[in-house]
């Protein structure tokens, strides 16, 4: 059927379209120079209007577009409109049945996802969202018309509501799922560890996000959560033991974790590994070679001897090397260097040996060629760093030569090799769930190993337990932003905070938490104590009062109670401890550096050495160009890592902390603690 404008109407209307033809599933409007095809699946409405003389048809399209036909005889226009409208509505009715079926399928998909007795991840909801949107884009009717049809209206509204508030729907589902699991598995959460898990711990265990950061403050039971998570995956049938990878940072920590798992989960099939042990396993399986880790890695004295021998050789044989080293040590390091053959000076050798060891280690950790190291250094130090790298190159070469002679690899080489094997597909990861302890200590190199493992299977979950407040190993390559910007680095997911400490009282917690959170770069989290503490739970005391303090402690400390004396450096060990065995024989006193105390706890803690200066705490920044270029950037907040060290020291104690300071030259931390209402005592 066709409708045409009258001759006069066409002339007066001066419109591009003067005729319309009904097609099988659409309408064509045209003129002498223009033609427009309107498929029914784009048509939103048809309006028939009467002007002063002629009729007019309007075809409403998406995006507020309207196509008009003018100048038609009114009676003809009405007949054409009724015929077209009936045809369009018949077609629309048929298409609504198809659309209704598609919409019902989307509701079934939503019901399946939300009805499953499983955690609904962000990735899954994103997938459903994408699938629904794709289905909507493939409907035979414009979505703007779905409200018109009884068979589509309700389903369409439900789909829209779910798409509009998808995050709320996900949270609601997961909250209901979590509550159901905590009830159904109440016995498991009560018995999996020596003490029942608290609600925050249990919720972290149940959380099924693919990338989950569990922030575990000092004494909040992180090991319990890791053990319970492994047990939960087994109990729910979500993984077999060989599909669970448990990673710890040190051999001792891995052994302790193994013991806990055997004791609590009654299985020997889940084994905690260090990152190096994991890399070794990947290399063995992926290359059928059994790499030997160099003996030098565990022999500090032998490493120092190797580096000093090569350093002396370079300086004695090459004038340019000797000149470069003298300049480096005097100008940048500001050391006193003897005249003449300074490389033969034993005191200088002893002082430099640990530095050379550290710098070679940083170069190995970077793993790149000299040009790559130089290119990745900050621009403002690149030229100077380039000179330093050239001085260090022979030492790196000597290290590689020693490894070759031993037919061995070093720790950095292990992880590099493992990443290459994973990227080439020579080892296929069997692990569906990766659980990592002390995640705040992770370095970019170890993060790359995790990424390479997860890349092989996008469904591999990462359950990372750590505490950015206790990140104190930047000198070993730890990069705090891998924790504080966890989801940017490891994919979208959740964060769970373990909000209760079982170690220290509320007063120690209040002081330590306020002290660390003065740095806005640290993640904010709650950490509540189960016991109250009085104002004296943290006390500032003159360092001359150490003997008097130990005298007093000897009067009331029980034989089983531990006293931990902590210092920034080994050489700050108090002289009083030389007589401790005879003067305070009943006191259980241990001394260690704050770094070494990580993971330890005691009834009473005495922090010594709160003074300013070269051996002070906070330690003055003494980084060379090598550290500046090869380690993660230093944080903007003053003494950020030293503050975290102080936090670690404060939170080793169950009952009381004494911070001993130098009255003549006090540490800046003393004033900060005073401002946190920590009292200064004249005597213990």
Report each predicted region and the residues it spans:
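P-loop NTPase Walker
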Residues: 23, 33, 37, 44-52, ...
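Conserved helicase C-terminal RecA-like lobe
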Residues: 433, 558-560, 587-588, 598-663, ...
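Conserved RecA-like helicase ATPase core segment
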Residues: 444-535, 677-681
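Conserved helicase NTPase motor core
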Residues: 127, 136, 140-153, 160-218, ...
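Helicase P-loop NTPase motor core
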Residues: 213, 220-226, 492-494, 500-587, ...
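A basic/glycine-biased coupling hinge at the interface between accessory DNA-binding modules
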Residues: 143-170, 174-176, 182, 234-408
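Anionic N-terminal interaction surfaces
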Residues: 1-19
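Accessory C-terminal helicase-associated subdomains
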Residues: 386-389, 393, 533, 543-588, ...
């Amino acid at each position: 059927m066709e409708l045409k404008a009258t001759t006069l109407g066409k002339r007066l209307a001066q419109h591009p379209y003067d005729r319309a033809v009904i097609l099988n599933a659409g309408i064509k409007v045209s003129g002498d120079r223009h033609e427009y095809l309107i498929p029914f699946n784009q048509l939103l409405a048809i309006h028939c209007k009467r002007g002063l003389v002629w009729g007019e048809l309007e075809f409403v399209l998406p995006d507020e577009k309207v196509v008009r036909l003018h100048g038609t005889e009114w009676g003809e226009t009405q007949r054409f409109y009724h015929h077209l409208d009936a045809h369009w509505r018949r077609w629309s009715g048929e298409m609504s049945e198809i659309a209704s079926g598609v919409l019902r399928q989307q509701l079934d998909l939503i019901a399946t996802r939300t009805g499953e007795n499983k955690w609904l991840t962000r990735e899954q909801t994103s997938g459903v969202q994408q699938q629904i949107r794709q289905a909507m884009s493939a409907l035979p009717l414009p979505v703007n018309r779905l409200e018109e049809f009884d068979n589509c209206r309700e389903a369409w509204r439900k789909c829209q509501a779910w798409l509009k508030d998808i995050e709320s729907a996900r949270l609601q589902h997961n909250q209901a799922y979590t509550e159901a699991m905590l009830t159904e598995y109440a016995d498991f959460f009560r018995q999996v560890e020596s003490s029942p898990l608290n609600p925050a711990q249990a919720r972290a265990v149940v959380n099924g996000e693919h990338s989950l950061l569990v922030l575990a403050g000092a004494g909040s039971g992180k090991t319990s959560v890791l053990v319970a998570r492994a047990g939960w995956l087994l109990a729910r049938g979500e993984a077999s033991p060989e599909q669970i990878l448990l990673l710890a940072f040190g051999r001792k920590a891995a052994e302790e974790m193994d013991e806990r798992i055997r004791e609590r989960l009654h299985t020997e099939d889940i084994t905690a590994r260090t990152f190096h042990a994991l890399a070794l396993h990947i290399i063995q399986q992926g290359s059928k070679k059994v790499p030997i880790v160099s003996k030098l890695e565990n022999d500090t004295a032998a490493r120092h001897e190797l580096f000093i021998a090569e350093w002396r050789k370079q300086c004695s044989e090459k004038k340019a090397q000797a000149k470069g080293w003298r300049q480096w040590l005097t100008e940048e390091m500001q050391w006193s260097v003897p005249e003449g053959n300074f490389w033969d000076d034993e005191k200088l050798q002893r002082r430099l040996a640990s530095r050379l060891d550290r710098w070679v280690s940083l170069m190995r950790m970077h793993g790149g060629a000299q040009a790559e190291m130089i290119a990745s250094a900050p621009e403002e130090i690149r030229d100077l760093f380039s000179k330093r790298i050239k001085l260090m190159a022979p030492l790196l070469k000597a290290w590689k030569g020693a490894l070759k002679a031993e037919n061995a690899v070093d720790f950095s080489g292990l992880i590099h090799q493992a990443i290459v094997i994973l990227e080439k597909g020579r080892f296929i990861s069997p692990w569906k769930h990766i659980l990592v302890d002390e995640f705040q200590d992770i370095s970019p190199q170890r993060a790359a190993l995790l990424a390479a493992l997860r890349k092989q299977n996008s469904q591999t979950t990462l359950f990372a337990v750590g505490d950015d407040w206790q990140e104190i190993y930047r000198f070993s390559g730890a990069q705090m932003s891998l924790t504080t910007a966890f989801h940017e680095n490891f994919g979208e997911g959740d964060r769970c905070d373990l909000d209760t400490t079982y170690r220290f009282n509320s007063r120690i917690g209040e002081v330590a938490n306020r002290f660390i959170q003065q740095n806005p770069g640290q993640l904010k989290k709650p950490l509540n104590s189960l016991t109250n503490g009085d104002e004296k739970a943290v006390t500032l005391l003159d360092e001359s009062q150490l003997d008097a303090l130990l005298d007093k402690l000897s009067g009331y400390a029980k034989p089983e109670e531990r006293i931990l004396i902590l210092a920034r450096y080994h050489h700050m060990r108090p002289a009083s401890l030389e007589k401790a065995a005879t003067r305070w024989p009943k006191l259980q006193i241990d001394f260690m550096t704050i770094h070494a105390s990580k993971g330890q706890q005691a009834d009473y803690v005495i922090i010594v050495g709160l003074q300013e200066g070269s051996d002070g705490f906070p330690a003055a920044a003494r980084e060379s160009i090598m550290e500046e270029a090869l380690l993660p950037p230093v944080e903007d907040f003053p003494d950020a890592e030293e503050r975290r060290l102080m936090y670690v020291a404060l939170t080793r104690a169950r009952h009381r902390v004494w911070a001993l300071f130098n009255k003549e030259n006090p540490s800046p931390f003393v004033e900060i603690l005073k401002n946190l209402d920590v009292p200064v005592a004249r005597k213990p």
